[in-house]
Amino acid sequence: MRERVLFFDLLRCVAAVAVIAIHVLAPYRNELGVIPMDQWLTAVGVNSVTRWAVPVFILITGALMLSDARPFDGKYYVKRRLGKVLVPFLIWSTFYAYLSGWTAQGFGFETVKEVLSNSPFHATYYHLGFFYYFIPLYFVIPLFQWMARNVDDNVLYTYLAFWMFTSTLFLFKIDGPWSNQMWLYMGYLPLGYVLFQKVPLNRSMVTLFTGFGLVALAVTFTMVVTNSLEAEKYTVGRWLSYKTLNVILAASMIFMLCRYFGEGLPKNVQKVVSFISQHSLGIYLLHPIFLWPMKEFGWYTGHPAWVIPVWIVLSGAGALAMSYLFSKSAKTRWLLP
């Protein structure tokens, strides 16, 4: 049990930091030919090697929920699982629709109205897009739970092999029924379960996953840079999608590395990791508030090698502190479950 706690705590921490990094570097991405090449390469490099962040959160969900051996209770599931995520999402979507109306020039109510009217189809703020494909996954989790308990492991392995094959087709723009967003995201659920429950935890296996992951990251960075230089503008194709083989391999690597090294953390580090993990969803939901002035007032002048870490710390610490304050009251802690 101790391994499980530390393992998932560490995963949530590294994923939260990586998500913030992706959002911090955003102003640099499209500056090819505007800022020095080394600065652009730094930002694009960080973007290329952190795309596993969001998929890792889905892997965690799959690993935990598919490992749950309790009988399925529909009422409990809707109230305690789905509702626990859906209701806060709706409230934060409304808040961020309001925030979207604020710019350095002032407040625009028309922008808020437009954002809210489009909210059934588009996120009200850039980081909330995650929930538009994460929440629907709750409708297929019971199916995967049944499969995990009742079918032979080879069925799961065959499913994952086919899913990864279709993600490869999608990466290379070979589209078909397999290009459906729900199909491409839901494979992360049984993958998380298999990585947690079925893959042996030994050095050779972790080395294998690490090798595949590092190659995937290197290829991703190379393709993004090459395509952008050829087009003379920032061009990523599908290499930075969350639904492609390269990102699946990178996310699997992070999962296995955290699983392998999680137990070796010093006690003082474990405490910090556990605290951050408890507030990882709060950090995810709240950090854009602290990035708002950076983006609106252009407070990112400087080399991204130091600007990105600085804003990760500032926005991450601010979001962590705010999440902690929310957790101190029963009236507010449900907003950041």
Predicted regions and their residues:
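Functional transmembrane helices that form membrane-embedded active or gating regions
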Residues: 4-16, 78-79, 83, 203-216, ...
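Hydrophobic alpha-helical segments with transmembrane-like composition
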Residues: 57-58, 66-67, 95-105, 111-196
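Interfacial loop-to-helix transition and helix-capping segments at the boundaries
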Residues: 42-55, 118-133, 170-188, 221-253
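Membrane-interface transmembrane-helix boundary segments in multi-pass integral membrane proteins
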Residues: 238-249, 300-320
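Transmembrane alpha-helical segments and their boundary/interface "anchor" motifs
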Residues: 47-56, 68-100, 109-124, 137, ...
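Alpha-helical transmembrane segments and terminal signal-anchor/GPI-anchor hydrophobic tails
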Residues: 202-274
